């Protein structure tokens, strides 16, 4: 959660950092899709997926290693029985699942709309992808934990909507900057 407050609202109850970083992944995917097509965009997603899951799993294993040093549990036992290590593992699986499903859906929606007005494909695909990402991630990571995951999901999605709007102009600039020699047809 984001620690702090804005206009008297406690942001920790409604917002996570992923709301700000995740839309940048859509910017990269949509720009790659526009310039090079669906195949290269899918490859970018797979690399991002592997990198993100690996980093989170390393963090989970790091927590488990600290717990297992006490001698009471093995590394694998600590990973599944220590609440902090298991939460990180659950977050890794939720994040990876949500990222992969949402980004691949984003690529397909973008491709269907690629011949429309320049902003429709990135706006619609990011909107649909962000919704799916938010739904999958927060449900898998936090459902049944007693944490305020529904309010985090709502705040996260609203922040993603703002970020989608803010990133449309950089999308247009990147596409114009790199367009002619690299661009795939339409």
Spell out what each predicted region is.
Residues 61-88:
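Membrane-interface interhelical connector segments
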Residues 112, 125-126, 137-143:
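A structural feature that tracks compact, well-ordered secondary-structure segments
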Residues 114-131, 182:
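Internal alpha-helical transmembrane segments of multi-pass membrane proteins
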Residues 1-46, 53:
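Hydrophobic transmembrane alpha-helices
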Residues 82-100, 109-112, 116, 144-152, ...:
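Membrane-embedded alpha-helical bundles of multi-pass transporters/translocases
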Residues 26, 30, 52, 56, ...:
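Transmembrane alpha-helical segments of multi-pass membrane transport proteins and ion-pumping complexes
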